Amino acid sequence: IFVSDGAKCDLGRLQAMFGADVNVAVQDPSYPVYVDGTVMAGAGGKEPVTENGFKDITYMPCLPENGFFPDLSVVKKDSLIYICSPNNPTGAVATKENLTELVKFAKANGCVVLFDAAYSAFIRDKNLPKSIYEIEGAKDCAIEMQSFSKPAGFTGVRLGWCVVPENLKFDDGSKIADAWARITNTAFNGASNIAQAGGFAALDD
């Protein structure tokens, strides 16, 4: 578990870690940072953006017809799959069945799920998962980001955390957690003591 300056910052650094030569799939609609971070890392393709988006990004429509959960069949093998639940901006929450399907797909196709759980504090139904790690096998294929901005109003204070399981690995067998530690130690000096003290108080609350 890596303490950070918020989920938004983690999302940008994660894309930088995976680099430009990775396939990326995003929910559509979704939080703009997923696409922006992908493009800034060079993974959006070299062609100019069109009304259909960036050529090298797979957009997964989330519509009433599919219960606002994407059709994973459009996702390429070895992709980073951005999933936000509850979703920003639709508010749709992925069910346990949805996330079970996602984990099975990711493991079968060599994908890594980047699960944005920033709005999980607003889930009141005990039957709906707040974390992807409630799903068996998720620790083999998923990274989860969390934020204090939504439940505690820390938008300007900046505090969050990122979970990178020890058994999550690159194709060469090296640990993603080790690469993430190097990225964060290089590009980030740590959340302030004031922010972390506020985080402890918010958790106690």
Show the residue positions of the predicted features:
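Conserved core segment of the aminotransferase class I/II
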Residues: 48-50, 134-205
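Short glycine/serine/threonine/alanine-rich loop segments
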Residues: 43-44, 111
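Active-site phosphate-binding strand-loop segment of PLP-dependent enzymes
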Residues: 49-130
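Phosphate-binding glycine-rich loop
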Residues: 1-24, 41
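Short hydrophobic alpha-helical segments of the AMP-binding
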Residues: 34, 38, 106
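A short helix->loop->beta-strand "cap" motif at the edges of active sites that frequently abuts
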Residues: 22, 108-111, 138-140
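Catalytic P-loop NTPase motifs of RecA-like helicase/translocase cores
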Residues: 10, 33, 120-122
